[in-house]
Swiss-Prot record:
Mutagenesis or variant effect for residue 182 to L: Slightly increases DNA binding activity
Region (Leucine-zipper): 323-358
Alphabetical list of SMART domains matching this protein: BRLZ (SM00338)
Presence of the UniProt keyword Heme in the record: no
Protein's UniProt name: bZIP transcription factor 68
Organism: Arabidopsis thaliana
Region listing for Basic motif, in residue ranges: 297-316
Recorded consequence of changing residue 320 to L: Significantly increases DNA binding activity
One GO MF term: sequence-specific DNA binding
UniProt-annotated location(s): Nucleus
């Protein structure tokens, strides 16, 4: 019982091998069947999803407010890995495949370096580096599954070389094609069977184009039977990096290490050309004009600085002259005020002396003043008595 189960499990784990293909279109058909089988398997898993809904149907959109929240099954706690033997979570059957979070509608093979076949303009499916090699020149079929990872890596490198244009150099015959298979177009006769991409075969034909009609005929026959792999099959969004190349015979401007020191150099000093470099007069003329413009700007800046300094000096000198005049006026006023103060002091002293003399005079004659007062008092009394009598 146990041995039979082990044998069954071993048979199930064995991969299903496919017989080697004898035509060049077999890899494309195998690759084109991969996405269809995956889609059919996904449909088989969730083909009866409407009969296993765990929640009641949602009300129409008009009766509830719009909310970005998904269904309540996402609110609860979910296991990262459910225990062994438990059924899957009910949200698997909640929505149809691609119903809630639909994947962008991208056809398989629409982007480079994908495991699916890339569509070509002539209608033939074209794999991007994961198909097995076809029959070689000696007639021996190659094992596609054993060489699959190697060819995939080589295919990516080959496609990268096709993009950056490293394999377009004339005179260098690359042995490996874009998908990793060796090109046998030169050794094949008039069979019409060839493998690999036509990018390297075209390079080989361009480099070996020296009058050999046999090799040219074999390469043309191979390209007629095999799928074309020229630059037209690349995606439209791929752009070839173009590096600017200077024209030969036109020297560039000489390197000058004293560019920053020109500001501190004397007037009219122009940096000389580097020794050993021949500079054309037409090429050096713009640089001379630039240096002249810089010198002119420097001189203008210096002149403006001088003018501003001179104006500031004149303004300060005028201010100093004005202050000196005001100081002289103030000194004259001060001297006049001092003279007036001295005059007032002398007058004050005179008044003090007069006051003291008057005081002495009043203090020396007090009796005379008293007798006069008594006489004046007696006379009104006599007049009053006479009036009464």
């Amino acid at each position: 019982m146990g041995s039979s189960e082990m044998e069954k499990s071993g048979k199930e784990k064995e991969p299903k091998t496919t017989p080697p293909s004898t035509s060049s279109s077999a890899p494309a058909t195998v690759v084109s069947q991969e996405p269809s089988s995956a889609v059919s398997a996904g449909v088989a898993v969730t083909q009866d999803w409407s009969g296993f809904q765990a929640y009641s149907p949602m009300p129409p959109h008009g009766y509830v407010a719009s909310s970005p929240q998904p269904h309540p099954y996402m609110w609860g706690v979910q296991h990262m890995m459910p225990p062994y033997g438990t059924p899957p979570h009910p949200y698997v059957t909640m929505y149809p495949p691609g119903g809630m979070y639909a994947h962008p509608s991208l056809p398989p093979g629409s982007y480079p370096y994908s495991p699916y076949a890339m569509p070509s303009p002539n209608g033939m499916a074209e794999a991007s580096g994961n198909t097995g090699s076809v029959i070689e020149g000696d007639g021996k079929p190659s094992d596609g599954k054993e060489k699959l990872p190697i060819k995939r890596s080589k295919g990516s490198l080959g496609s990268l070389n096709m993009i950056i244009g490293k394999n377009n150099e004339a005179g260098k015959n690359s042995g490996a094609s874009a998908n990793g298979a060796c090109s046998k177009s030169a050794e094949s006769g008039s069979d019409g069977s060839s493998d690999g991409s036509d990018a390297n075969s075209q390079n080989d034909s361009g480099s070996r184009h020296n009058g050999k009609d046999g090799e040219t005929a074999s390469e043309s026959g191979g390209s007629a039977h095999g799928p074309p792999r020229n630059g037209s099959n690349l995606p439209v969004n791929q752009t070839v990096a173009i590096m600017p190349v200077s024209a030969t015979g036109v020297p560039g401007p000489p390197t000058n290490l004293n560019i920053g020191m020109d500001y501190w150099s004397g007037h009219g000093n122009v940096s000389g050309a580097v020794p050993g470099v021949v500079v054309d007069g037409s090429q050096s003329q713009p640089w001379l004009q630039v240096s002249d413009e810089r010198e002119i700007k420097r001189q203008r800046r210096k002149q403006s600085n001088r003018e501003s300094a001179r104006r500031s000096r004149l303004r300060k000198q005028a201010e100093c002259d004005e202050l000196a005049q005001r100081a002289e006026v103030l000194n004259g006023e001060n001297s006049s005020l001092r003279a007036e103060i001295n005059k007032l002091k002398s007058q004050y002293e005179e008044l003090l002396a007069e006051n003291s003399s008057l005081k002495n005079k009043f203090s020396s004659a007090p009796s005379l003043e008293g007798g006069d007062l008594d006489k004046n008092e007696q006379e009104p009394q006599r007049s009053t008595r006479q009036d009464v009598a």
